[in-house]
Swiss-Prot record:
Anthranilate 1 binds at residues 94, 125. This is Anthranilate phosphoribosyltransferase. Homodimer. The keyword Transferase applies.
Length: 357
């Protein structure tokens, strides 16, 4: 680990780290890794964890700091065997914390992308602030979410999609998650979920609820040589929105390019945020069934848009992918996948497969 190479005189302490953060100073190399290791091993106290989580968010973390946090978390995670599924899979996940209580757009988009033939390795959790997170909704649909590493890999290999339930794969994170729940406000830990997929997929459509931190996340993905679209709806959503424009940080070949994206340019009607609002797990599961069953409207539009975004990100693994043609192809594929019934069939197959395990 980075912190293991610190000189003896530089050995971090909580007062030195919290002192730097609370005076707005960036941490030195290895200090964020040391702090995260203390948290993941259960050495840090709840007060130290809370102080670190809030102070880091207020200071505004750098990509280097967040990379250290994510790398330590992955070091402690249960690994999904990528010799079975490779790493050219795609994740579709957001930070949460946008407060909008929308239906589970990324979950629906993930099913559509998998049905379009691109392997999906989704990482997710129960709701932190909304009524129903991706895990809650999948459970209501009948997908087993408590699978271990080999079972998740088998699901990707057999069905084309797998779900890594964060609690199952990051057992050492329990020390931080209890504090996070008690705090009830966004912290630096909100950024870590999308950055710590235990299968380390190389492609992703990653939503960030905070525009000022989206670029930080993009920097982490750039250092991993990923092909990722980090997206922030200009209405505050941690998804590609259909109510207005979105800002996209396009990560490809180690570079980050910031773009403004207007779905109207591809023929999408402006939606009202109220049309995208969800409810509890049963309500959101019913929305999934309706959209995959062909129901038209604002939710379907948002699902098609986000599924296309993930297809564009995956296409970006090939260096010759062109932006507008990739979007046109992605939107056509996402639409066809729903209209042909392929997405609906894939969900049914996924439920059957996981229930047999």
């Amino acid at each position: 680990m980075a912190w293991e190479h610190l000189r003896v005189t530089d050995t971090p302490t909580w007062p030195s780290i919290l002192g730097r953060l609370t005076t707005g100073q960036n941490l030195g190399t290895g200090q964020a890794a040391w702090a995260m290791d203390q948290i993941m091993t259960g050495t840090a106290t709840p007060a130290q964890i809370a102080g670190f989580a809030v102070a880091m968010k207020l200071k505004r973390p750098t990509s280097a700091e967040v990379t250290e946090l994510a790398d330590v978390m992955l070091k402690h995670a249960r690994r999904i065997p990528t010799d079975v599924i490779g790493n050219e899979t795609v994740d579709i996940v957001g930070t949460g914390g946008d407060g909008a209580n929308t239906v589970n757009l990324s979950t629906m988009a993930a099913i559509v992308v998998a049905a379009a033939g691109v392997p999906v390795m989704k990482h997710g959790n129960r709701a932190a602030s909304s009524l129903s997170g991706g895990a809650d909704t999948l459970e209501a649909l009948g997908v087993r979410i408590d699978l271990g590493p080999e079972q998740v890999a088998a699901s990707v290999a057999e069905v084309g999609i797998g779900f890594a339930f964060a609690n199952q794969f990051h057992p050492s994170y329990k020390h931080a998650s209890a504090v996070r729940r008690e705090l009830g406000v966004p912290t630096v830990f909100n950024l870590l979920g999308p950055l710590t997929n235990p299968a380390r997929p190389r492609a992703g459509l990653i939503g960030c609820a905070w525009a000022e931190l989206a670029e930080v996340m993009a920097g982490v993905f750039a250092s991993r040589n990923s092909s990722v679209l980090v997206v922030h709806g200009d209405d505050g959503l941690d998804e590609l929105t259909t109510t207005t424009t979105s800002t996209i940080w396009r990560v490809q070949a180690g570079t980050v390019e910031r773009l403004t994206f207007d779905p109207a340019a591809f023929g999408f009607q402006r939606a009202h945020l109220s049309e995208l609002v969800g409810g509890d797990a049963e309500y959101n599961a019913a929305e999934v069934r309706a959209v995959l069953g062909g129901a038209k409207g604002a939710v379907r539009d948002a699902v098609v848009l986000n599924a296309a975004g993930a297809l564009v990100a995956h296409a970006g693994l090939s260096s010759d992918a062109k932006w507008v043609p990739a979007w046109e192809a992605g939107l056509a594929r996402a639409t066809e996948t729903i209209d042909s019934g392929a997405a609906e069939k894939l969900l049914a197959r996924w439920v059957r497969f996981t229930q047999k395990l």
